[in-house]
């Protein structure tokens, strides 16, 4: 295809976040064709009913194509020492650029160049990245980086990639200025995270290094990362320090004259056994009987966290597995946008879900259609302005074609919708009162309604005796003793629940309110990635397998995590407290509402960082003396592990994880190029290869090719990986390339 095919001054350019998303947009036009030239891919589309019938160019990125510059790109003195056993130049820190600048991320240059030729010449740009803060950040950052005039920029904001909603979205474009504050919020968040992460990670890591404590990889400090780790550490301390205490429950063993027996209980628990009134008599009376019909409405629809919680409880899925499945279902047009914290829909969604009820019934044959009018519990346009709850789209999948996890996650979403259309759950609750203070209750299911989707088995009956008010019973008081139990360790699912409901752990009313409004630590869309990163990348937490079907591994801090948690709690406690996150979230929310300037917020972050640099060099060495670091193993006190002779320089040794900032292989010889072109262990992690092992590292550094499995879009490929000598980067090629 010749380059002349590419429009020189396009009327409209649609900027998508991902290739699949761009394809969905293009396919919504009646006329569409994909092209490729030397600069990349693009679509040319036209439709008499869309965008004035003009010619439209659709281009796609691959997520974030820009990143904040590294410290050394601002100032060569920021960052690392070239000599000695020091890696961070604390004498030139903290790192505080006067202006934060972006650069093109590794591997994204051609994507940016492809986008540039269209975006800079377009009469109107339509931002069509994901409808969230991150999507806004990706697009606006690129437009600003390319100096694109945003005066006439529009925003496509939709919650489904189906053809109908896409077309409707193009017919009802928003002005980009409406969503621009989301960019300000997210960009400011990324700068603040950079300031905290870059500076305090370097500071803590180097001070530990200087004082003889050498961990494998840096001691990562992050706004959400540290409080998340601290939740696990604090739970561990609660379990370790837990001391069982007795408590008592006052019961009456009752027997009718017909021989029917039951146990009635006094409400509450007693710590002091002597505080319980003694019942010495052997006969008592039934003082009251109440039977009430009670109703329970269906649960709310699910946001992403609710979906993850449900999948963990019912299916034993890890949160990240559920999120991945939901995002795949969104790409396939079977679910609405999953990265949401909203639990309601609009009447538009309610109506099409109602129309599709008979189709969904094929998945749940015993479903009934009772509730046909929208109720505010599930349908509330005022709360669904930006996003919706996760619900099925109009497109019905063939379940047999879906992978197991995707099928099950899809059915969870359908089930929540079918429950919304069902009748309430009705049951009769009977309470028998004995001697005024003791009660026993039982319930009989009258109509399971929506509960039938979640309650297994037939209607449950809890047997109660046939008695009357005033009837005399044989009674015997029995005080049962129990022991309190320690809290349970977190797993990935319960940790995310704790992150969501962290306000419940806070006493301060103001902080509690802010955290509740911010919906906890992180967001439903980011929590899984945060937990995964703390485990796999930073090695601060680890998973311990648990026996039992559908039981998730428990989480515990590693030796490295325990040490960092102690350091934080004794030197800079605020970094590990949800309170700091609450204050940040409140400030960022105000930025998105344009009531606080980004500069004012970042000035406060600046003060926090400077305070750490002024106090920690004195405090941290003292604190380290109070911490047992022996559990860190060889990396804790001794020199890095030697795995072999360096084939590059021939004189130095290849060291395993000698670098405190990165989990990498490097050379002991200061002049060796492997010192500046280290081989990072996690280079291939995003393709499913967890970590480069020592034996593999030696072969790669020698210039050999290693067979490996690459995972892309759920498919596995046989590849060969090798180290490019000129750059030190890991490259790959197909092991069995297709012949042309």
Model-based region annotation:
Residues 2-13, 145, 152, 177, ...:
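Basic, low-complexity terminal or inter-domain segments flanking catalytic cores
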Residues 39-76, 226-269, 418-463, 666-668:
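Structured, non-catalytic alpha/beta "coupling" segments that mediate domain-domain communication
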Residues 177, 271-302, 308:
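Metal- or metallocofactor-binding catalytic centers and their adjacent structured scaffolds
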């Amino acid at each position: 295809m010749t380059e002349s095919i590419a429009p020189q001054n396009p009327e409209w350019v649609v900027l998508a976040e991902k290739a699949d998303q761009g394809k969905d947009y293009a396919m919504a036009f009646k006329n569409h064709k994909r092209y490729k030239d030397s600069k990349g891919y693009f679509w040319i589309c036209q439709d008499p009913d869309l965008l004035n019938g003009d010619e439209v160019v659709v281009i796609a990125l691959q997520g974030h194509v820009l990143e904040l510059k590294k410290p050394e790109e601002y100032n060569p003195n920021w960052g690392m020492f070239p000599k000695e056993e020091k890696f961070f130049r604390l004498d030139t820190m903290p790192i505080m650029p006067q202006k934060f600048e972006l650069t093109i991320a590794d591997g994204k240059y051609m994507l940016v160049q492809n986008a540039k030729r269209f975006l800079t010449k377009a009469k109107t740009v339509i931002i069509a990245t994901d409808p969230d803060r991150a999507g806004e950040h990706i697009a606006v950052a690129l437009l600003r980086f390319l100096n694109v005039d945003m005066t006439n920029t529009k925003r496509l904001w939709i919650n489904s990639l189906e053809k109908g909603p896409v077309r409707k979205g193009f017919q009802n474009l928003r002005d980009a200025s409406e969503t621009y504050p989301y960019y300000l919020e997210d960009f400011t968040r990324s700068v603040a995270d950079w300031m905290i992460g870059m500076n305090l990670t370097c500071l803590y890591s180097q001070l530990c290094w200087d004082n003889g404590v050498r961990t494998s990889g840096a001691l990562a400090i992050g706004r959400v990362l540290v409080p998340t780790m601290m939740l696990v550490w604090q739970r561990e301390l609660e379990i370790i320090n837990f001391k069982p205490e007795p408590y008592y429950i006052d019961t009456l063993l009752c027997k009718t004259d017909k021989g029917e027996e039951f146990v009635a209980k006094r409400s509450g628990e007693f710590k002091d056994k002597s505080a319980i009134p003694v019942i010495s008599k052997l006969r008592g009376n039934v003082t009251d009987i109440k039977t009430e019909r009670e109703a329970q409405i269906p649960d709310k629809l699910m946001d992403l966290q609710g979906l993850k919680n449900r999948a963990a409880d019912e299916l034993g899925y890890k949160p990240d597995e559920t999120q991945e499945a939901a995002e795949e279902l969104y790409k396939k047009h079977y679910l609405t946008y999953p990265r949401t914290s909203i639990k309601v829909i609009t009447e538009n969604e309610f109506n099409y879900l109602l129309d599709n009820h008979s189709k969904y019934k094929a998945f749940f044959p015993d479903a009934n259609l009772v509730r046909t009018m929208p109720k505010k519990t599930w349908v509330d346009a005022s709360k669904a302005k930006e996003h919706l709850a996760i619900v099925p789209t109009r497109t019905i999948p063939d379940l047999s074609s879906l992978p197991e996890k995707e099928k099950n996650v899809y059915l969870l979403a359908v089930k929540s919708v079918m429950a919304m259309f069902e009748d309430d759950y009705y049951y009769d609750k009977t309470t028998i009162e004995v001697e005024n203070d003791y009660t026993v209750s039982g319930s009989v299911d009258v109509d399971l309604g929506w509960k039938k989707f979640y309650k297994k088995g037939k209607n449950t009956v809890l047997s109660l005796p046939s008695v009357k008010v005033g009837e005399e019973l044989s009674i015997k008081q029995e005080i049962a003793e129990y022991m309190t139990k320690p809290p349970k360790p977190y797993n990935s699912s319960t940790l995310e629940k704790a992150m969501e409901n962290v306000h419940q752990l806070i006493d301060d009313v103001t902080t509690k309110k802010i955290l509740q409004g911010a919906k906890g630590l992180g967001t439903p869309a980011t929590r899984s990635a945060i937990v995964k990163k703390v485990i796999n990348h930073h090695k601060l937490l680890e998973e311990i397998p648990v026996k039992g079907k559908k039981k998730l591994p428990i989480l515990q801090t590693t030796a490295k995590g325990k040490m960092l948690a102690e350091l934080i709690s004794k030197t800079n406690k605020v970094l590990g407290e949800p309170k700091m996150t609450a204050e940040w979230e409140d400030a960022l929310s105000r930025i998105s509402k344009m009531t606080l300037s980004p500069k004012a917020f970042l000035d406060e972050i600046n003060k926090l960082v400077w305070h750490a640099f002024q106090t920690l060099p004195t405090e941290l060495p003292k604190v380290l003396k109070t911490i047992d670091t022996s559990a860190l193993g060889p990396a804790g006190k001794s020199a890095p592990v030697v795995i072999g002779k360096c084939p590059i320089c021939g004189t130095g040794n290849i060291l395993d994880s000698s670098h405190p900032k990165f989990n990498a292989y490097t050379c002991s010889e200061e002049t060796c190029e492997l010192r500046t072109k280290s081989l990072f262990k996690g280079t291939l992690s995003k393709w499913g290869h967890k970590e480069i092992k020592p034996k593999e590292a030696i072969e790669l550094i020698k210039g050999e090719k290693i067979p490996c499995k690459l995972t892309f879009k759920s498919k596995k490929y046989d590849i060969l990986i090798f180290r490019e000598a000129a750059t030190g980067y890991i490259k790959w090629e197909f092991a069995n390339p297709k012949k042309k």
